[in-house]
Swiss-Prot record:
Subunit structure: Homotetramer.
Protein name: Tryptophan 2,3-dioxygenase
NCBIfam families linked: trp_2_3_diox (TIGR03036)
InterPro entries with a match to the protein in the record: Trp/Indoleamine_2_3_dOase-like, Trp_2-3-dOase_bac, Trp_2_3_dOase
Keyword Heme appears in the UniProt entry: yes
Family in the record: Belongs to the tryptophan 2,3-dioxygenase family.
Reaction equation(s) it catalyzes: L-tryptophan + O2 = N-formyl-L-kynurenine
Cofactor(s) recorded in Swiss-Prot or TrEMBL: heme
HAMAP family: T23O
Length: 294
């Protein structure tokens, strides 16, 4: 060994890493008497005190949190959808693509959330069902706004919100506004594609009617992706979104059937039978049909 070399340092057994030492070494802030804390910023007191079970059933907490968290995700979904629609209307497709991709990922998150509720067995649900009254996810105003924003318009779906003028105003606004697909078709028309005026200047409150001319416009895009790259990408973003939405709906059906079978829903619908009918709704029909005709 070189005479000037230092021997290897011996481990300092007195400096054992502990949680306290890690926090000390990181200089983490511990006093929030004068600063906004994590809980303050997120308003956790309000959120975590919003679970008010009405029954003695242990599993009601799961039921409440499942639906409350779904409503939070739907709030974000609406935030992104509304911005995406505005961006498509303004020809700002780059921003719209990011927002639509986020909406699809939120829907995937909601698909997986059904796995948690599916741990509730029929007897467990039956123990709390009498306490639900007529309350039902069918009455979710945010979900109705999402359906309307995606083009599934139905005037009858305004009625469940008539008792709350503030909520009715939001649902009514979504009902009367152009949907995401309406704005996509208007964009195609602005780019010179032959979308008929019957589909670009119409009564937005009416259900969308499939059009052979609209399919031809999309076929033009899909037959030459290089020339119409951003419109082609828009078509695929819409496909991703509807694909995710179908999975979300399907998982809803299977979870409800697993828990209550074919009993009527608490909101007065036929339950699973009603949900199965909703699986047949196609939001962007021409984008799906063109795949056969390409």
């Amino acid at each position: 060994m070189c005479p000037h070399a230092h021997p290897p340092a011996k481990p300092d057994h007195g400096a054992t890493t502990t949680p306290e030492r890690i926090v000390h070494d990181e200089k983490a802030q511990l006093d929030f008497s004068r600063d906004m804390s994590y809980g303050d910023y997120l308003q956790l007191d309000a959120i975590l005190n919003a679970q008010k079970p009405l029954s003695p059933a242990h599993d009601e907490m799961l039921f409440i949190i499942q639906h409350q968290t779904s409503e939070l995700w739907m709030k974000l979904m609406l935030h992104e959808l509304r911005a995406a629609i505005a961006n498509v209307a303004a020809d700002e497709l780059g921003s719209a693509f990011k927002m639509l991709a986020r909406v699809s990922r939120i829907m995937e998150q909601l698909v997986h959330a059904w796995d948690v509720l599916a741990t509730m067995t029929p007897p467990e649900y039956s123990a709390m069902r009498p306490y639900l009254g007529a309350s039902s996810g069918f009455q979710s105003y945010q979900y109705r706004c999402i359906e309307f924003a995606l083009g599934n318009k139905n005037a009858a779906m305004l009625q469940p919100h008539a008792h709350r003028s503030d909520l009715l105003a939001q649902v009514q606004a979504a009902y009367e506004a152009p949907s995401l697909y309406d704005e996509a078709l208007r964009l195609l028309a602005r780019r010179g594609l032959a979308v008929p005026a019957s589909h670009t200047e119409r009564d937005w409150t009416q259900p969308y009617l499939e059009s052979a001319a609209v399919e031809q416009a999309w076929l033009t895009v899909y037959r030459d992706p290089k020339q119409y790259w951003d419109l082609y990408q828009l078509g695929e973003e819409l496909t991703d979104l509807e694909d995710a939405f179908r999975l979300w709906r399907f998982r809803h059906v299977t979870t409800v059937e697993r828990i209550i079978g074919f009993k009527p829903g608490t909101g007065g619908t036929s339950g699973v039978s009603y949900l199965r009918k909703m699986l047949d709704v196609v939001l962007f029909p021409e984008i799906w049909k063109l795949r056969t005709d390409l």
